[in-house]
Swiss-Prot record:
InterPro entries referenced in this protein's UniProt entry, alphabetically: ASH2, B30.2/SPRY, B30.2/SPRY_sf, ConA-like_dom_sf, SPRY_dom
SUPFAM superfamilies (alphabetical): Concanavalin A-like lectins/glucanases
Protein name according to UniProt: Protein TRAUCO
Compartments (UniProt record): Nucleus
GO biological process, one term: embryo development ending in seed dormancy
Species classification: Eukaryota, Viridiplantae, Streptophyta, Embryophyta, Tracheophyta
Species name: Arabidopsis thaliana (Mouse-ear cress)
Amino acid sequence: MESLQSNSKIEEAEQNPKIEEAQVSVSLPEEPTGVLLPSELVDDSAPPESSDAVEESIETASEAEVSISLLEGTTTGTALLPSEENDLAPLESSGIIEEPIDTDLEKLDVVAMDVDQPGSDLKIESDSFSEEAPTTSSSDNPKSPKLDSVANQNGSAMEEDEGDEEQDDPPHKKLKQLDCLTSVAVKEEEEPEQVLPSEAMVVEEAATLVASAAKKSKSKKKNNNVWVTKSTRKGKKKSKANTPNPAAVEDKVLITPVPRFPDKGDDTPDLEICLSKVYKAEKVEISEDRLTAGSSKGYRMVRATRGVVEGAWYFEIKVLSLGETGHTRLGWSTDKGDLQAPVGYDGNSFGFRDIDGCKIHKALRETYAEEGYKEGDVIGFYINLPDGESFAPKPPHYVFYKGQRYICAPDAKEEPPKVVPGSEISFFKNGVCQGAAFTDIVGGRYYPAASMYTLPDQSNCLVKFNFGPSFEFFPEDFGGRATPRPMWEVPYHGFNGRLETNGSEDMKS
């Protein structure tokens, strides 16, 4: 019924002969925010449907020529009929006419553009109608909204035809001009829903171009030129490595830790043998005559200023005081013996214990005498090193280097200490031999040594050395052993067996 009503109104418009020329310009409302792309207006598979009433109205106006132009700038025409300037309320268009327009608008994809852009106005111009089919309106206003709706439909059909012609051979790269590759990527992230399928392909191609350009820039950094020979540079490096280093030509000196007070001794040719003030523990106290020693802070060692390396020698030690908790370990020690430990603590010293008469070496106690010794006893110490000079290790070699004295590192191929054949250490108690304590000892310089122990807040454990020439209990019979010489006859041998001068010139070599 609605279609029939619309046809009657069109016939009334055709009976009006007064309208010979009519130019109708229709402007779309300014609400849409984008321009419709012609390539997306019409679906090829489903052409827009048109009602029968519209087809009849078009047939009656067969000779009418309608020109529709899409203006990008300002619209110019003889008569502009916006919806606001019409005095009469626009007639309600039939649903049959509005249906195809609505369906077409739903299918459109809108690209966001500036709303104020003037290219969104459409102008429809009609030159003239034929005299056989004049159009009249039932109202006084000759421009009826029915004509507007018909013109809108005709204009959309013409636009669809133009879109089909342009879609036949569209330029691929002119769909959207890319100012720069990065702007496309940013726009795609900001408006992912509005990107058309064709634009997505363009964006993908742009991304691939960017990736390829990045790869090319990276590849340029790598110097893969096959025409450049790399052997010349390596050869120069090798030649530099082969050149002798002037610093390497100098003598190499390996600096090693030097023992405490290596170039210092308290023995002089004018003095007789006595206890050393240098080679002793700090907690060991020595008397003014440097023959009596005592300690109350645990086992600490003190040794004499001179030692023997060859021959048979003898000295005595008298236990002056042990106290309630005092103990002693007496014996012989080399120059490498630990001063902060008792005699017999390591392999460089040999001791005789007071508690049970055990002998001690390398911190191992072994049964030796029938009983120990106590206060007032005199212990005799005997050592025999036949031809010990040939088995003694070489003394350390000192050199002067840049104003300082250094000890040369020992040779890696140096042989271990040699055992002196027939060597022996024996202990005597009040002139009675306790038997051979140690035999076949290694060669070296042996010094008389003693170590004392006493608990704190008690009187010191005191012992007194006697180097001769007169002894309190000198043995009358040594049981077939070589007769020893008193230690006071040991000549001055300087520091570490080397004779020292005022300038210590012997150490400079």
